[in-house]
Amino acid sequence: MRLLTCDCTFMGQKHSGSVSVEKKNQENDGPPTYEIVFGWSQSFENLMKHRAGQKYFAEFLKGEYSDENILFWQACEELKREKNAEKIEEKARIIYEDFISILSPKEVSLDSRVREIVNTNMGRPSASTFDEAQNQIYTLMQRDSYPRFLASNIYKTVMGTFGIKEEAV
């Protein structure tokens, strides 16, 4: 059994979480239950630990022209699960080209301090090369996009499949 972990900072406080692969797969099989979907409104962490939550959130972000944020976050999670050193280096370079490079159409918005850390880390890519950048993007999505997602038609429609009206959400 492997653990998937995310260590992020939000409003100056450390956020840590881990989910076993077996449990995660059980939670993600089939359509989400009411409890799972309602849980998405209780915390961003709940939303992000479910494949369906990420799917609906990505759909929302695509409509806001900011889906590069979740795509980057997901790519970083995949990189952290990789154990083969050669594949880690290859995946890190792809992530850099796709999301960090100023030439990329999917460039994520990072402050100069974090961008410099990533550039330094790319000298010797590892599974943690993008940790600072991933934390910054996670926080950005949590503060900025997540509240709008909860008020979006996408989330209201998903809740509506359980007979829940807008007022209750």
From Swiss-Prot:
Keywords attached to this entry: Phosphoprotein, Signal transduction inhibitor
Gene Ontology biological process: negative regulation of signal transduction
UniProt-listed InterPro entries: RGS, RGS_sf, RGS_subdom1/3, RGS_subdomain_2
Ranges where the RGS domain occurs: 39-158
UniProt keyword annotation of Nucleotide-binding present: no
Phenotype caused by lack of the gene: RNAi-mediated knockdown in ASH sensory neurons results in hypersensitivity to dilute quinine.
Keyword Phosphoprotein on entry: yes
GO molecular function: GTPase activator activity
Gene3D superfamilies in UniProt: 1.10.196.10, Regulator of G-protein Signalling 4, domain 2
UniProt modification remark: May be phosphorylated and activated by egl-4.
Tissue expression summary: Expressed in a subset of neurons including ventral cord and head- and tail-ganglia neurons. Also expressed in non-neuronal cells including pharyngeal and uterine muscles.
Pfam families linked: RGS
Role, per record: Weakly inhibits G protein signaling in nervous system, interacting preferentially with the G(O) subfamily member goa-1. In vitro, it acts as a GTPase activator of goa-1. Rgs-1 and rgs-2 redundantly adjust signaling when worms are fed to allow rapid induction of egg-laying behavior. Modulates chemotaxis responses by regulating negatively the sensitivity to quinine in ASH sensory neurons.
Name this protein carries in UniProt: Regulator of G-protein signaling rgs-2
Native species: Caenorhabditis elegans
Classification lineage: Eukaryota, Metazoa, Ecdysozoa, Nematoda, Chromadorea
